[in-house]
Amino acid sequence: MIPLSIRVPASTANVGPGFDSVGIALSLYLHVVVKEESDKWQVIHSFEDSIPTDDKNLIVSTACKVCPSLSPHIIEVTSNIPLTRGLGSSASAIVAGIELANQLGNLNLTTDQKVQIATNFEGHPDNVAASILGGTVIGALDGKNVSVVRIESKELGVISLIPNEELNTEESRSVLPDVFPFHEAVKASAISNVLVAALCQKKWEVVGEMMERDHFHEPFRLELVPLLPSIRKCAKEFGAYGTALSGAGPSIFILTPYEKRQEIAEQLARVFTSMKVCELEIDHRGITVNKEEHIGL
């Protein structure tokens, strides 16, 4: 068979007040290379031992749920997306699994169908839609119906501060309240609305201001990511637009003017020496599939 390669970008979600709705694709990638058929699924990887190497692997289990009749294959998986750091590692695996089923099962899924299926697996569209479409996405899940709008943000630079500590999404969600007062919801929703409008109109200073005024989740997660206020203060002093938790954390996501991203990243690295400071870009392509006779990662 002609080798098949799937590349899925990482993503950051929320961007402050866009909780479970706004996502941005990032220039870190999960690669899946599909090799020969086999009598059972085999996943070759160099991750920690807790990541399955059989049909229990998230990529494979997702693919088999989408297309139960798939023939088992050997696949090789590599990734520079940190696990359980709020950069969409599980979402990228789900998206890769859907595309694996699409390619091997000849499903001819549309982009909208991929987003719908991925959102059903993930429970919210922000990470998965960003990984599929690239760029910045704003999405909503209403029952089983998903609506997603994609916008370009090519003038922006991205910096991620990644701690050594992991933070499980379930743990980070457990600190969120079950009930949100109506007046707080109105205030939080208004801030989110302005964030989205500013993203669409490329008013980056307003974007930065709104992404630091979340009421939905960041106030409750501060105990899990105590460095956020000091990182936010320094980033602003160094010329960044704004700072927010990346997804559920613990990574921190910073938007900057594109031309200043390297300078700001270097300044932050000198201050926050316990964290890995990554100068990233927004990925504008989304998931890509390559069918060539010679594929290298």
Curated annotation (Swiss-Prot):
Q: What's in the GO CC field?
A: cytoplasm
Q: What is its main location?
A: cytoplasm
Coiled-coil stretches, from where to where? none
One record GO biological process: threonine biosynthetic process
Localisation per UniProt entry: Cytoplasm
Which GO molecular function terms does the record list? ATP binding; homoserine kinase activity
NCBIfam families in alphabetical order: thrB (TIGR00191)
Report what the protein is called: Homoserine kinase
Q: Which organism is it from?
A: Bacillus cereus (strain AH187)
